[in-house]
Amino acid sequence: SLSGLAGAVAAKGGIGIISTAQIGFREPDYHQNPHDANLRAVKKEIRRAKELAHGGIVGVNIMVATRHYEEYVRAAIETGADVIISGAGLPVTLPEIAAGVPVPGNGRPVKLVPIVSSLKSANVIFRYWMKKYKYLPDMVVIEGPLAGGHLGFTEEQLRDIPGMHFEEEADRKEIPVVMAGGVYTGEEAGKWISRGLSGVQMATRFVTTEECDAHPAYKQAYIDAKEEDIVLVKSPVGMPGRAIRNTFLQKAGKGAIPHGKCHGCIKTCNPADTPYCITEALIRAVEGDVENGLLFCGSNACRSERMETVGTILDEVADALK
């Protein structure tokens, strides 16, 4: 998700989220200097999304596992991001980083939102942030096993979710809890909210929108996908993920795929023994080479039947919640 989709969602009353993962791939110097290209693009995409949002809420998703994590957080806050969502690891230092960055102009203080996959990981974050920073999350995203991309869940699955209501008595701060993963329709969103959650995060449904920044061929791959085409894969970064079966995955299953210069994306990736470069694979996919790229998706990608608009989807969700 880049500024086009994030801005459109925010303009319609949702929280539009930009992914910072190798966000600078469209910059002319990306392959020569990915670090600077990514930081530049973070700022460009946030500014553009906020212009499109017309006062709506725009946030960024920054993986803890990303190299230069702190720099991306700082750049996002300096540019006026309203929300920082952070997972793929425990964002234990996020409040400290944010505290050191002045909010631009008369902007709103940035909201800090960890992604958790279990009650245990949520409690770790709560206790650590409170003890070290006297700060509690402004919201929590629970990422379930039906989500797209890298998955944080293991055996605990969704067992604890219905009882996850967080409140810190000392501060009387009630913390909204948002469900992510496997939510595709307004009716499904309503079911989670009726169970006491504050909201839902939807991603897969928005890939096949006119406003999504991905290549049309990427969107068509979702529309063409059948349930049996969606498989679990092991990412080079050491986490499981879900993707659409294609030529690339068949080749990856038979052995390492040669790659070029390291783009320095993930802390845990060792270029010397990685089976393939996840950055190169994801960029090929988002640029339209859907047979030779990695098509990350959620479990509901096979439910995509046609192109839609952001407004149509959010109207459906709003109607279901009435």
Predicted regions and their residues:
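Short His-Asn-centered micro-motif
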Residues: G87, A180-G181
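Conserved active-site-proximal phosphate/metal-binding subdomains
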Residues: A147-V178, Y184-K322
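Short linear motifs at secondary-structure transitions and domain/linker junctions
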Residues: P34-L39, G59-N61, D82, I115-S117, ...
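Active-site entrance/lid segments in N-terminal catalytic domains of soluble metabolic enzymes
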Residues: S1-E168
